[in-house]
Amino acid sequence: MTTLNFTKTEAPEWLLAMWKEIDDKTFGKGFDCFADDAVCNLGVADWRGREGIRESLREFIDKGMTTHHDVVEYWDGGSLKIFRGLVTMNFDDPAKEPVRPVMTHFFYMDKTDPAKVSRWVGSVGPTEF
């Protein structure tokens, strides 16, 4: 069994920069928070490597939506960071109403470089019932 203590705090700059890159559809330096060999599991996604994560998110977001991520709370447990927020999804298709699902994300920090994320596990939604 592993026990971690968490501190509720303001979201760090690296996390805000990553969300901004997604919201602005720039996908640039905000992704430098990931280790080169990071793994991302969002729902059923299994994306490998910093560049794989960047490109897969670009493909997903560019399929017809604009997003805005809001931080609701952030918990720092040292090697594990937990984020809860809301994402507003505005679709390019005017027939689709915007949605604002809850998101929860776990960021496991790299053992050799604790400033980098080695694994990102998260979920968004549901977006409808």
Which functions belong to the PLM regions below?
Residues T2-N5, E10, A17, N41, ...:
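A beta-strand edge to alpha-helix "cap/lid" segment located at domain peripheries
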Residues M1-G28, D32-C33:
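Short, low-complexity N-terminal intrinsically disordered segments enriched in polar/charged residues
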Residues K29, E51-G52:
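An acidic, carboxylate-rich microenvironment
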